[in-house]
Amino acid sequence: MKHSQKRIFMDIEKMTSDEFKAFCRSGNKNYFTRIRKMPLQDLLFTMINRKGLTLALELRNYMKLAHPGVSISKPGYLKQRMKLNPDAFLELYKYHNRNFYADSTFSTYKNHLILAADGSDINIPTTTETLKLYGSASRKNTKPQAQIGLGCIYDVMNRMILESDCNKVKFNEMRLAEKQMERIPETIGNIPYIIIMDRGYPSTPAFIHMMDKDIKFIVRLKSSDYKKEQNSLTEKDQLVKIKLDKSRIRHYEGTPDGERMKELGEISLRMVKILLENGSLEVLATNLSQTEFHTEEIKELYHMRWGIETAYETLKSRLQLENFTGTKPILLLQDIYSTIYLSNLAEDIILDTERELDQKEANRKHKMMINQIVSIGILKNDLIYILLETDDQKRNIL
């Protein structure tokens, strides 16, 4: 049995556990207790099986496959959805991830996971409620488009979304990333990692927080960040002392961050100049040692950050994240987290297949590559058969 298959079966077992059912009820003991046309497990399966069709067609196709001769109305279905804890799939994908990293088959770079933090605006149905709750990034004098600010931490080598939070469209990305990094050990345990961030994330307190916690990072600086120190660089890879003078502490005066900055007096950052493909010269700040990671490796690691951009594109275009089944905030969160779960599930299966193919093609000069787009399409069509199959032997064949 493939590793990913085993994890899918573990997910199904979790979905049917009393503990998970209680979590899905959000504290209401009466939810999902009566036998209905759409019990909890079917409710979860319909969300995993979304294909971007109208809700009426989605329900018709699912019921035809799972319960031939039985139908459910759109209002009846949405009534059941409104009872479901919006964090149900958040809990489920983190459970799947914990099992993934408990395995020894994941990829690392010099024994480190390579993680990227980034945010993306998600277009959601525009209603008075969603505008009030999440806001809009639309320009003045234009029709407002409600948006959720989705912030994620992504494992770029294993293509897994580790952390995700739905926020107002305008949110503090660094503050969120720090909260998410506090939770990451719950998923990966004590596996060391390097976090990569783009401009907009860095701040002196953030660097201090990460260094105090021994978190390794690579962050792209704006030209205005530590401008004096950047202008004084004489080498393309240089260790720089950042003096924490009054001008840098002033903004944090009277806060724990300000007190910590006064206590330290200065911090050391390694600044690395890199040339981007568009010809612009950028400066990266890192606490990785020069002996362990040379200049070209820092550049290589930073470019790996692009994987999170690809992940957002996959969520939006391949998995149709922005094609929501309703307008209520609880339905939006359910759709977002179920899509992230499906994305991680797809990548787990694809990675398994890639490893299997690598073993078969080990002696070939030209190795075959897995087409991710085709693979996700096949998975979306076939996954429901695995979920609905109750015979273990038939599941293994699927």
Over which residues does each language-model region extend?
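Single, function-defining residue in the core of a domain
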Residues: 1-53, 69-71, 77-84, 88-94, ...
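Short, charged amphipathic recognition helices of the HTH superfamily
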Residues: 52-66
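A short, well-structured juxtamembrane/interface segment
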Residues: 96-105
